[in-house]
Regions:
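Glycine-rich, flexible N-terminal cofactor/catalytic loop recognition
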Residues: 1-71
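A contiguous loop/helix-start segment that scaffolds small-molecule binding in enzyme catalytic cores
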Residues: 2-3, 7-14, 89-90, 169, ...
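Short active-site oxyanion
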Residues: 37-43, 117-121, 169-170
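Short beta-strand scaffold positions
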Residues: 45-46, 104, 173
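Alpha-helix capping/helix-boundary segments
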Residues: 49-51, 98-99, 128, 178, ...
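Conserved helicase motor
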Residues: 67-76, 149-152
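Glycine/small-residue-rich loop that forms an oxyanion/phosphate-binding "nest" at active or ligand-binding sites
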Residues: 78-127
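Class I SAM-dependent methyltransferase SAM-binding "motif I" and its flanking Rossmann-like core
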Residues: 107-166
Length: 285
């Protein structure tokens, strides 16, 4: 594990290293990741099968004990892993794809380790968030990552309403089977003509970057879902049972800045609207 970087920790105990892994292609793995996987003694993985597949794809013979670390076991496993760190054992933390702590429980282990005065460092690398932003062509100077939208229709509508006037570019993860509904909900809250980009299967063989307005993309997602050949056991497809396949990252443009130019009537939006509400100011004494 890395031993040359400084950290706010005390230096006692083991080191927690957050290791970014490829989001699609195994050969996107960095040389440093290959070296750390090969020499790790304890790996905490969101899905143990995925890290073993990655190691096999990279011709790495894992010597490490590999333990699972995902939402359902997070509370118990955080305490166990913290104990390992306090006993002086280094831990390599990996997620299914991309950077640990981004839309997964890894941040909880980081928080616990930092609170205990233990050293935390990172092995940087791929992230679907920044990759999607880069290929989207939408502004990247300011953005917000919103993770997976709420599943409940009411809660999802409230979240989208809160984001509708945010001028930052917004990035979401979404499951293929819910993509059409999410795009339709965003079109209703943000406006049908808001630009957006659907990034599907980033870096993989069937990568697809679909650009358009929210309304156009919602229609596209419905058509793709209806064309999905997956069927029920009896061979009859259920209405709405199809889905856009693959891992989805959705990038949505932020709200446009309101124009401060005079309109056809000579009024300046915002300024003249406010003056009509408060009336003329009294003269100075």
């Amino acid at each position: 594990m890395p031993g040359s970087n400084t950290d706010a920790g005390t230096g006692d105990g083991g080191v927690l290293t957050l290791a970014a892994v490829p989001i699609g292609r195994a050969d996107d793995a960095s040389a440093r990741l290959v070296a750390e996987l090969a020499r790790a003694s304890l790996i905490a993985a969101e899905d143990t099968r995925r890290v073993r597949w990655l190691a096999s794809s990279l011709n790495i013979e894992l010597k490490a004990r590999v333990v699972s670390y995902y939402d359902a076991v997070e509370a118990r496993r955080t305490a166990e892993l913290l104990g390992e760190l306090q006993a002086g054992r280094d831990i390599l933390l990996v997620t299914d794809a991309g950077t640990p702590g981004i839309s997964d429980p890894g941040y909880r282990l980081v928080s616990a380790a930092a609170a205990a005065g233990l050293r935390v460092t990172a092995l940087p690398g791929p992230s679907a968030v920044t990759t999607a932003l880069a290929v989207s062509g939408l502004p990247t100077d300011r953005f917000s990552f919103e993770g997976f939208p709420p599943r409940g229709q009411g809660e999802r509508a409230r979240r989208f309403a809160e984001l509708a006037t945010d001028r930052r570019t917004q990035v979401f993860f979404e499951a293929g089977r819910r993509l059409a509904a999410t795009l339709a909900g965003l079109a209703a809250s943000h406006g049908e003509d808001r630009p957006a980009v659907v990034c599907r299967e980033l870096t993989k063989t069937h990568e697809e970057i679909k650009r358009g307005t929210l309304a156009e993309l919602a229609d596209w997602a419905v058509l793709v879902s209806e064309a999905d050949p997956r069927a029920t056991p009896k061979g009859k497809k259920k209405p709405g049972s199809g889905a856009v396949r693959g891992e989805i990252t959705l990038v949505v443009a932020g709200a446009a800045r309101r124009s401060r130019r005079p309109g056809p009537d000579g009024r300046v939006p915002g300024r003249d609207d406010l003056s009509s509400l408060i009336g003329p100011l009294p003269p100075l004494p």
